[in-house]
Amino acid sequence: SCAKMRKLVHPDFYHIFPTATTKKVKEAESDAYLPLWREFTAEQPYGALPNWLEHIGVEGNKQGNISAEEARKIIQKLSLKAFEAEYKILLIWQPEMLNQSSANALLKILEEPPAKTLFLLVCNDANKLLTTILSRTQRVSVPQFSDEDITSYLAEKAHVESSRAKQIAYLSEGNLNKALALSKNQGQGKHQWFANWM
């Protein structure tokens, strides 16, 4: 069960995340992107929405969103009995990307959830959620990474030289994804690196 959760393949662990149509995938639903989602979270555990959209091949100015149809399908899935575990878990990544109709569809199940069902809403800005959704959740704030944490991570995992890791940690403002992006530019001259960062 733990191995299935780690690989994001547990049958009682559902995922909703912003999607968009691409040349390869014509249905903008989370299920269609699930293999790519698992790959993305393994490769970029601190990835942001733009990283995700790039990973799935979204081109141009398309923005990801979570459709009302997707919300209705997840309600159907959650109404089923759990397959293996005692609880069913729904992870909604970037719930700020719910449009009005999808938020309203999910609101119904948040108001009256099936027994032994947990909802995890992982967002960057809780103020962008509908107040009716926010009022039905228990907020847990995750602090930004400290400069020391980022410096240590960059030195150990990305093999960035210590003084350079400290500079990047300071510039990244507690955002490990931003720090990793900045560290990839370390081969460039300092002036070029700073210009790109700006």
Q: For the regions a protein language model found, what residue spans apply to each?
A:
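Charged, glycine-rich active-site and insertion segments that engage polyanionic ligands
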Residues: S1-K4, Y14, A115-L118, N124-M198
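Clamp-loader machinery-focused feature within the broader ASCE/P-loop NTPase space
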Residues: S1-S101
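Conserved adenine-binding aromatic site and its adjacent loop/helix in ATP-hydrolyzing domains
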Residues: Q76, K108, S135
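Conserved catalytic/switch belt of AAA+ P-loop NTPases
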Residues: S79, N104-L118
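Structural recognition of the conserved hydrophobic beta-strand(s) that form the central parallel beta-sheet
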Residues: I89-W93, L106, T117-C123
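Residues immediately C-terminal
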Residues: M97, E112, K128
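Generic recognition of short, well-ordered alpha-helical segments
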Residues: S101-A105, T132
